[in-house]
Amino acid sequence: MKILVVCGHGLGSSFMVEMNVQEALKQLQAPASIEVAHSDIMTASPEMADVFICGRDLEENAQRLGEVIVLDNILDKTELQEKLEAKLKSMNQL
């Protein structure tokens, strides 16, 4: 399984959220086989990952990708972990 964090340019904010996703996966004791990466929203495509994560500002553009976790606040680690846990449970990954 692969998770792709996307932002406008694929640099700072998506990289920061990627690191937070990795931390959340450890805390959730998720399978080590789950991969996490980051990219810009424009080059992201549905076949690049099973789950995509983005901020609320990119929600409309990200809908074309498939399974998307939308964060109201990309700095909120609690929100990220709660939404990630719910998504992974719904996909039988936890």
For each feature predicted by the language model, list its residue ranges.
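Conserved active-site segments centered on acidic
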Residues: 2-39
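Structural signal for conserved beta-strand scaffold positions within catalytic alpha/beta enzyme cores
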Residues: 5, 38, 54, 69-72
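Alpha-helix N-cap/helix-start motif
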Residues: 14, 61, 77-80
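Short acidic active-site motifs
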Residues: 39-44, 79
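Short, polar loop motifs at secondary-structure junctions
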Residues: 39-41, 53-60
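Short loop/helix-cap segments at secondary-structure boundaries that form the rim of catalytic
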Residues: 44-48, 58-67
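Ser/Thr/Gly-rich flexible loops in soluble cytosolic domains mediating phosphotransfer, phosphorylation
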Residues: 68-94
